[in-house]
From Swiss-Prot:
It comes from the Eukaryota. InterPro entries: Ornatin (IPR002463). Its main location: secreted. The lineage of its organism: Eukaryota, Metazoa, Spiralia, Lophotrochozoa, Annelida. Keywords: Cell adhesion, Secreted. This is Ornatin-B. The keyword Transcription regulation does not apply. Belongs to the ornatin family.
Length: 52
């Protein structure tokens, strides 16, 4: 069941710096999110990075 992320969750990926990732960026679809933030939340496998 897909639960619509809250605004906090949407912003989480852009604000969070994940240890071990290049430049400590959050991952989207397994790749570091270096621009903007994750579209969905928290590096889900089907996530994409978006500019925001």
């Amino acid at each position: 069941i897909y639960v619509r992320p809250t605004n906090d969750e949407l912003n989480y990926c852009g604000d969070f710096r994940e240890l071990g990732q290049p430049d400590k960026k959050c991952r989207c679809d397994g790749k570091p999110c270096t621009v903007g933030r994750c579209k969905f939340a928290r590096g889900d496998n089907d996530d994409k990075c978006i500019s925001a």
